[in-house]
Amino acid sequence: MSKVYDWFEERLEIQAIADDITSKYVPPHVNIFYCLGGITLTCFLVQVATGFAMTFYYRPTVTDAFASVQYIMTEANFGWLIRSVHRWSASMMVLMMILHVFRVYLTGGFKKPRELTWVTGVVLAVLTASFGVTGYSLPRDQIGYWAVKIVTGVPEAIPVIGSPLVELLRGSASVGQSTLTRFYSLHTFVLPLLTAVFMLMHFPMIRKQGISGPL
C-alpha cells in the first residue's frame, strides 16, 4: 500500500496539498454561524444525489409527470425516502442560504477585498431561489401548476416587453408542456451547471482571502 501511495505522492505531491488544506489559519472569533455556507453546500450535494436518483423514474410530460411522482412515492424502492430527503434538504438549503447571507452581511464579509466573493454569493442565492421555483412545478399537481402560472405571469405587468417575456418563460401563451420542459431543463441541467461554475469561483476566493473579521 505504501508503494502505491509513494507512486502517487511522487507525481502529484499529495502531502503538500493535504498540508495546505489542513494548515489553513482559522481566526479565533469563528463560531458555528460561520458554518452556514458549508451546510448550504452539503444540502446542495444531497439535492444533486437525490435529484439524480429521481430522474430514473420521473417523466417530464403533462400527462405522466404527476403519475411518475406517485410511482416514486408508492412503488419505487425507497422512492418515498429519496423524494422526502430531496424536499427536506431543499427547504434546509434555502433556509441556510438566507442565514448565511445575513451572517456575511452583518460581519461585513462583503467589504473590500471580498466584493467579488459577495457578488458570486448573491448570484448563488438567486440560483438557489430559482431551483425552488423550477422544482415546485415538476410534480404537476395543483399547487405546482398555479404557483408556476402566478410566477410566470408576474412579468406581464412590465410595459412593452411583458407579454413576450411571459411567453418566453412559459414557451407558449399558457402554462403547458413547453413550460414543464423548460422548467425541467432549467432545474436538472442549466441551474446545476451555473451553480457549479459559480461555486468554483466562490470557494477559491474564500480560500485565498480568508474568513472576514468579527462583528
Swiss-Prot record:
Keyword Thylakoid recorded: yes
Recorded superkingdom: Eukaryota
Membrane topology of the entry: Multi-pass membrane protein
Cellular component terms (Gene Ontology): chloroplast thylakoid membrane
Keywords: Chloroplast, Electron transport, Heme, Iron, Membrane, Metal-binding, Photosynthesis, Plastid, Thylakoid, Transmembrane, Transmembrane helix, Transport
Cofactor note: Binds 2 heme b groups non-covalently with two histidine residues as axial ligands. Binds one heme group covalently by a single cysteine link with no axial amino acid ligand. This heme was named heme ci.
Disulphides: none
GO molecular function (one): metal ion binding
Residues that bind heme c: 35
Xref: InterPro entries: Cyt_b/b6_N (IPR005797), Cyt_B6_PetB (IPR023530), Cytb/b6-like_sf (IPR027387), Cytochrome_b_N_euk/bac (IPR048259), Di-haem_cyt_TM (IPR016174)
Residues that hold heme b 2 according to the record: 86, 187
Compartment(s): Plastid, Chloroplast thylakoid membrane
A Pfam short name: Cytochrome_B
Cofactors that this protein relies on: heme b; heme c
Stretches that traverse the bilayer: 32-52, 90-110, 116-136, 186-206
Annotated residues for binding of heme b 1: 100, 202
Coarse class of the protein's main subcellular location: plastid
GO terms, biological process: photosynthesis; respiratory electron transport chain
Family stated for the protein in its record: Belongs to the cytochrome b family. PetB subfamily.
Role description: Component of the cytochrome b6-f complex, which mediates electron transfer between photosystem II (PSII) and photosystem I (PSI), cyclic electron flow around PSI, and state transitions.
Further details from the record: Heme 1 (or BH or b566) is high-potential and absorbs at about 566 nm, and heme 2 (or BL or b562) is low-potential and absorbs at about 562 nm.
Database matches in PANTHER family: CYTOCHROME B
Assembly with partners or alone: The 4 large subunits of the cytochrome b6-f complex are cytochrome b6, subunit IV (17 kDa polypeptide, PetD), cytochrome f and the Rieske protein, while the 4 small subunits are PetG, PetL, PetM and PetN. The complex functions as a dimer.
Protein name as annotated: Cytochrome b6
